[in-house]
UniProtKB/Swiss-Prot annotation:
Membrane topology label: Peripheral membrane protein
CDD domains recorded: Cyt_c_Oxidase_VIb
Full protein name: Cytochrome c oxidase subunit 12, mitochondrial
Domain of life the protein comes from: Eukaryota
GO terms for biological process, alphabetical: mitochondrial electron transport, cytochrome c to oxygen; proton transmembrane transport
Gene3D superfamilies: Cytochrome c oxidase, subunit VIb
Originating organism: Schizosaccharomyces pombe (strain 972 / ATCC 24843) (Fission yeast)
């Protein structure tokens, strides 16, 4: 057997971004980022983490929000100081 046969074929990677949301028609997506973060945690609080439509909000905030913001918001939620009701 050759060395190439021993290696697995590379996995196909598909790149996707968030679709259009009529609530946020402008190019500045900061509000869309923040609202998707809030919507995700409200959704899993109401329906549970296994509820598939909640994943749409997760993908939105993971795609739009800088990770530093998400880390800070996670910390604020844990401390009870998050600036919006969830």
């Amino acid at each position: 057997m050759s060395e190439q046969e021993d290696q697995e074929a590379p996995k196909q990677f598909t790149f996707g971004t968030v679709g259009f949301d009529a609530r946020f028609p402008n190019t500045n997506q900061t509000k869309h980022c923040f609202q998707s973060y809030i919507d995700y945690f409200r959704c899993i609080k109401a329906k549970g983490e296994d509820f598939v439509p909640c994943k749409q909000f997760w993908h939105a905030y993971q795609s739009l929000c800088p990770m530093e913001w998400v880390e800070r918001w996670d910390e604020q939620r844990e401390n009870g100081t998050f600036p919006a009701p969830i």
